[in-house]
C-alpha cells in the first residue's frame, strides 16, 4: 500500500513516476520476440507489420493482438490502481501501441504536449486528463524519455505542438534511462519528448488511458495517430468483469467512420500500384506453372 501511496503522490506532483520492476525476464523475452516479429516488414496488403508516419519511428499498432502478456501488463495491480487513483473509475485503455526509434542526432521531436482531446469542445470547461504507460523493450541509455516536472499542473488548455515551447533547463527535467522492462507512467498534458541524440535503435510500448466520454480532437483521429483498439479474444479468458472493463471491453462502440488524412493525396496511385502488383504476381505464377509443366 505504501508503494501505491508514494507513487501516486509523485505522479500527482511531478506528472511522471518510474514504477518498480514488474516484468519477469521470461515474460520480457516473449514480448521482445513478438514485437520484433512485427518489425521484419512493413504492413502491406495482407502483411502484418510496422507502419511509418515519420522519418524516425517504425510504428507497431495493436499490440494486444500479439500475445497475452501485452494484455496482462496494464492489468498489473499497481498500474491499475495508479491509473484509477490518478483519473477515476470510468477510465479504460484506449490505445496500445509501440514503436522502434531509429538512430538520430537532431531534435526531431521537441518538447510538446499531446493533442488528443478536442480543444474547441473544452474551451470553456476543465480539460480532460489521461495517463500513458511506457515500457522499454530494450536497454535505453540514449534517446531516453524526458519530462518537465510539474508542467502538467494547469486546469486550462496548454499550447500543444512542438513550436510553442522553449528549451528547459536540465534540472527541471526527469530523464528516464533504464534496462529493458523499465516502466513509467506520465500525464501527457505535461511537456515531454524523446531526448537526442538516440545512438541506437530501440523498442518501446505505450498504453494510453482515458475516459470513453472524452470528445477527441479530429487531428488525433484523422491523421493515423489514433487506432481503434483491437485484441485477440483468446487473451481475455479468465479475466474478471473489472479487468475487462479496464481494457475497454464494456465501453460503447464508436459509430464514427475513420477518415484518415495521412497520405490522402496518394491513395489513388497507391491503390493502382498495389492492384498492379497483385495482377503481375498472378500472371508470373501462371506463366511459371506452364513452364514447369513442360
Kindly label every feature range from the protein language model.
Residues 1-13, 20-122:
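Non-heme Fe(II)-dependent double-stranded beta-helix
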Residues 23-25, 98-103, 116, 138-142, ...:
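Short, solvent-exposed loop/turn segments at secondary-structure junctions
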Residues 67-72, 169-173, 194:
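Active-site rim elements
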Residues 96-98, 133-135, 205-209:
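A structural signal for short, well-ordered beta-strand segments
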Residues 107-175, 216-221:
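Catalytic core of non-heme Fe(II) oxygenases with the double-stranded beta-helix
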Residues 177-191:
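Conserved metal-binding segment of the jelly-roll/cupin
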Residues 190-191, 195-294:
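Non-heme Fe(II)/2-oxoglutarate
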